[in-house]
Each structure stands twice: as C-alpha cells, then as structure tokens.
Amino acid sequence: MSQSWPAADIARMILDGFDDYREHFRQITDGARQRFEQAQWQQAQKASAARINLYEEKVGETVARLHQAFSTESLMDVSQWPLVKSAYISLIDLRFDDELSETWYNSIFCGLFSHDLISDGCMFIHTTRPSLRRARAAQTRSYKPQGELATMLEQVFADYRFSEDYADLPGDLRRLEAQLRENLPDWVCKDPELTLELFSSVLYRNKGAYLVGRIFTHEEQWPLVIPLLHREGRGIQIDALITDEADVSIIFSFTRSYFMVDVPVPAEFIGFLKRILPGKHIAELYTSIGFYKHGKSEFYRALINHLASTDDRFIMAPGVRGMVMSVFTLPGFNTVFKIIKDRFSPSKNVDRATVIEKYRLVKSVDRVGRMADTQEFADFRFPLSKFDPACLEELLEVAPSTVAVEGQTVLIRHCWTERRMTPLNLYLEHANEAQVREALEDYGLAIKQLAAANIFPGDMLLKNFGVTRHGRVVFYDYDEICFLTEANFRHIPAPRTPEDEMASEPWYSIGPHDVFPEEFPPFLFADAGQRKLFDQLHGELYNADYWKGLQEAIRAGKVIDVFPYRRQGLEDE
C-alpha cells in the first residue's frame, strides 16, 4: 500500500464532520432546558424534528467535503480504506463519545460506497471499543437520607433548580415523601444504607422534564423517575414519582419521542440506564436519547450475533397479510422486518415513494407513545439457510424487486424494522371479557392521542394496531397516515329522495381527503359485541364534529398533554 495515500487526512476530515454534527446536536439539546423553563412547546417540537434530521444533513455535508478535497482515484480506492479505519481508531481512542464516532464513520463509508463493499476491514461492523471503560468523572448525584427522607428530598430539589420557581415546593415534597413511602417497603425507608442516585443532567421531552435514577440498598434496587411539569403562570410542579420497572420502561419506550439530555459520556449514561432497566437492549436506550443511528448499529450487531449463535430462521409474521407491506420475523428476536410489495391491493391509492415518505414522517413527529419507532435499512444480506423456504418463496413472489437470492445469500435491498407486537385483531380473538374491554379502551385512546398530536392513522383497522408486552395498544402501519389537519371530516349528507336512501353507491361527491366518521363502526368491527362496546367507550369518534374540534385546537397552536406515566398520588385534586 502506498504511504502517500491520504488515509490520515481522510480520517481527520471524517472526524471533523462528526465534531460538527456533535456540536450542532449539543446546541439543540442544550436548548431544551430554556424551552422547558419558558414553556416554548411548539419550539420544542421543531427542535426535536431538527435534531432528528441533523444526522443525515451532516453526513451529506461531510461526504461532499471529502469529494471536494480528494481525487476520486484516491477517495474511492476501497482497498486502501483499512488504512483510513486504522488512522481513525487512533484519533478516537481518547474520546468520551468514541462508540458514536464509529457509527458516524460507518455512515460516511456507506455514503461513499455501495453496500456490497461493506466489510469489517473497512468499517466498524464490530466495535473496537472496550466493554469496560476507564473511570471518568461521576455523572450522578448521590443522597443518603439516614432516616430523614424529607431532608434528603429538600436537598435533591435544592440541587435541581430552574429559572422558573417551583409552584409549591413544600407541598410537592410532602406528597413526594408520602408517595415514596407508599411505593417502597417500610424496611427500605428505614434502612441506614438507603441511597438515592440521580443522573446529574435533567432529561427533557415534549412538555416534561425528568429526574432519572435509582434507589438502592445493599440487597435491592428500584428505578426512580420524577417527572416535572411547567404549569404556565404557576411555575414548576413535581408531577409524579415512579419506582415500578415496567412503568419506567414505558417512559423509555420505542413508541416515544427521543429525550433531550446532556450526556458527556454516552456509554456511561447508557450503562446507568441499563442498570435500572435491565430488560432494555442498549440499542433501544441509545435511541431513546436521540442517538438513533448508533441504536441502529447496536441493533444490527445484536441481529447478526443472534443469527450466528442460534438456529432461528426467518418466517412470515403472524396476522393478516398486508396490502402494501410484507412482514417477516425471527421467532427468537423481538423484531419484525417490513418490505414494500411490488404491487399493492387495488384499494390502496398509494405508490412506493409515498409509502417511504409516510414511514420517514413517523421518525420526525411526536409519536405520543402510540406509534412504533422504525429503523430503515438498505442492502441487508442474510444466509440463505436462515430463511424458512415458505417465507422466502412468499417474499420473492410479492417483492422480487426488493428480495433476491445471490448464491447462498438473500439480499433485502430495502426494509424497515419495528418492535414485534401481537396484532390487536389476534389479541382480541383470544382475550377474555375484561381484556377485550381494556384493549378497546386503549385502542380508542390511541386514536384520540394520535389525533390530538395531529396524526390521523387513515386505515384504523384492528390489524394495523398491536399490543405491547405492557398491554398498550400501538399503531404500526403507516402507509395511509396524514396530518389530521389535512383530512376533511364530513357528516354524511341526508338523502334527498327515497332513491338516494336506497342507492348502493353514495349519491354525494367524495373528495380525496374526505373522511366520514359515521362509517367507522361497520368498517372497524365485524364483531357486533365489540362494535357496541367501542361505541360506549369512544362513541365520539363517530362524530365529525369531534374531529373538527381537534383540528381547530391544533390550528390554534395548542400542544396537548400526553403523559407516559400514570398521574396519581402527587397532584392535589
């Protein structure tokens, strides 16, 4: 290999691009505190979308600078890129965000070269970062009550102050102490070794701020999340205290927008979260704080490790076959893989470009805990032996432009991944009476909360919603979604004549964006009992005026409250 080849210069320019991205990422993230203090909710939504789009923008800029700075002959000689990787490793070894910089390098490589040139020699398919890092400055604050919970809580909130005052801190602290004693066994509150540990930085998302940490003794630990709200005109309010692991897991769910939080050493913060949420994969934790590209890297590493270490094979996902997407899964890996079919059902008035646009839209909007996050992949390559023959046959039949067999390898040219859930229609088939009621209640709430966040699902059939392991109903089929304000909700006109009333087809004109909520009941529910129950629970969804009222509120700039936790115990009635 030629010593004059500019490996070190290319590596430095890639890292300079990463530094530029990180600086802009930090600027947006650091503004979250001020947006919370000043109740700038619409600005918070815009900042969230801007931060998501930032990564691809900066990758594009860096790739363009590389093309400008180096000749095509030098830059595009892939055989020399192991030298670039080696030079890059030496540049990132002392960084506090070294694992993120590896993912950035991978993105630049993929922006330059086709995916069939991917190899661990040229990029970081496997990380070079040590699993155990050097000790660094503490990112947490620790408190020991030593029998005085009230005094400890006073100290906590003396440390976590904002430019806006707490509305009623003494009252909040009394309620907080009472809730803590109610949530934990009595012996824990009296344990002299009881310790409360909180991450030093506050996490921000939508209208909330969150203190995140844990409570522990020598024998046991509990996660701890304290959400704060800014009540405009009243001040900051402590809204809840959460110590249940399942409830904390929901706060960090794949259905939520990404937190904004200052994390000087990302790997250490993820390790901290992993201690309090051991059931969460680190891919999901990185994604939850906005590092979704690195979450994607960790997901891919987990996937290839699973395939290499198990006999699992891809099968078609259970449920009704999609009219636009074909969905397959690995039984032992909690994910579904979705590809766009070459031909859609005639009833679907969309094309491939529109479907891609809709799925990418979901990434940038507030999912309010009711839409599954997705990761988009290009040129997945899997061993042929890892596919059930029936699964592969179906994929090749419905999407031959996307799926191809190359020798002993299956190429998936484009797909999305989502968390696997139980389709709501299948869940209801096996649910008892109480479970049916609970699921339909949550199904209606999901539709309402999405609508209040300016999202209209379009196709609201039960099969397009899933039930998570925590029992929450989540929307996951996005080919017909639109902003609620784009839909035209109408009442069905009264018939003009007896002939109108008996007509098999609508006698009135219907525009492309028209929606008639009165038509929902028979469309959504084949089961008459479920239809009647849903009418009792959420009958207003059948009224066009309900939807129009939401549209008016959204156009007036109202940002709704959708809380990722049960609000009980702290706020006075």
From Swiss-Prot:
ATP binds at A317, P318, G319, V320, R321, G322, M323, K338. It holds the Pfam family AceK_regulatory. Bifunctional enzyme which can phosphorylate or dephosphorylate isocitrate dehydrogenase (IDH) on a specific serine residue. This is a regulatory mechanism which enables bacteria to bypass the Krebs cycle via the glyoxylate shunt in response to the source of carbon. When bacteria are grown on glucose, IDH is fully active and unphosphorylated, but when grown on acetate or ethanol, the activity of IDH declines drastically concomitant with its phosphorylation. Its EC number is 2.7.11.5, 3.1.3.-. Its main location: cytoplasm. It catalyses: L-seryl-[isocitrate dehydrogenase] + ATP = O-phospho-L-seryl-[isocitrate dehydrogenase] + ADP + H(+). It comes from Pseudomonas fluorescens (strain ATCC BAA-477 / NRRL B-23932 / Pf-5). It is found in: Cytoplasm. GO terms for biological process: glucose metabolic process; glyoxylate cycle; tricarboxylic acid cycle. PANTHER family: ISOCITRATE DEHYDROGENASE KINASE_PHOSPHATASE (PTHR39559:SF1), PTHR39559. Transmembrane segments: none annotated. Belongs to the AceK family. One of its GO terms (cellular component) is cytoplasm. The active site is at D373. Keywords: ATP-binding, Cytoplasm, Glyoxylate bypass, Hydrolase, Kinase, Nucleotide-binding, Protein phosphatase, Serine/threonine-protein kinase, Transferase, Tricarboxylic acid cycle. One of its GO terms (molecular function) is protein serine/threonine kinase activity. This is Isocitrate dehydrogenase kinase/phosphatase. HAMAP family: AceK (MF_00747). The keyword Disulfide bond does not apply.
